[in-house]
Amino acid sequence: SVRPFVIGNRSSLEQALTETGVTCAIRKIDALERVEPAAGVIDVLEPTAFDCGSINIGQVSAACGHEAVKYFEHAVELAQRGEIQGVVTCPINKEAVHAAGYHGDIGHQEILARMTGSALTATMLMTPGLKVAHLSTHKSLGEAVAYVKRPVLIEKLKLTADCLSRWSSKKPKIAVAALNPHGGEGGMLGREEIEEITPAVTDLQHMGYDVVGPYPADSVFYRAIAGEFDAVMALYHDQGHIAIKVHNFEDSITATM
């Protein structure tokens, strides 16, 4: 059975419950063995001593950014030791993390990559009826466009296909979204489809992967929702995030591959 608990600060969680009017008991634990799921009770493990009394709600805080990273790092360490079987994260304030001095760790994905020594990672957003992997996430739009390169596409699509294969017994079919309007219109609106994306798709097909595209971004997600594809590879943050959140915001999750 699932035995959930929170890694974080008990006082800040109690304050949040008060602010939101939620009635729930907070129980501090000092060891995982003490986790005892009960209705109306949240078990909290505090890995650090942190005084949140001076924190102003709604303002970016370097101290809070530091604590958020430390809590997540502790969760990852527990998972690496096999003491827990999964980690679920809440949104992290990237500005606070940056203010705390973690300039390379923009979000959870970067922290996971650092702690696991993974050179290749990617983000996948999932909601019932739609899965969207992302070639890039935490890059400016200009940087994201420059990142659309054949070798990167091949590696990220292979990673996506391999992860999907672990979740299902069937061979996944992945569609690649185009970067430019109308898929570039034969090069008139951009040449990334011709010079980078299509060659990457062709290479993967020769390797045996069921990868197709590029297809215009204004239709590929609709086709995936209709069941034509198992997943879509979006080429930058908002291209994929908007599709997922418009389709089903409330039931969407993010997974790091």
What does each model-identified segment do?
Residues 1-108, 151-235, 239-253:
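Contiguous, glycine/small-aliphatic-enriched amphipathic segments in soluble metabolic enzymes
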Residues 114-130, 257:
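Short, flexible loop segments at boundaries between secondary-structure elements
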Residues 110-112:
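A conserved active-site-flanking secondary-structure segment within enzyme catalytic domains
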Residues 97, 117, 137-140, 146, ...:
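A broad detector of the eukaryotic-type serine/threonine protein kinase catalytic domain
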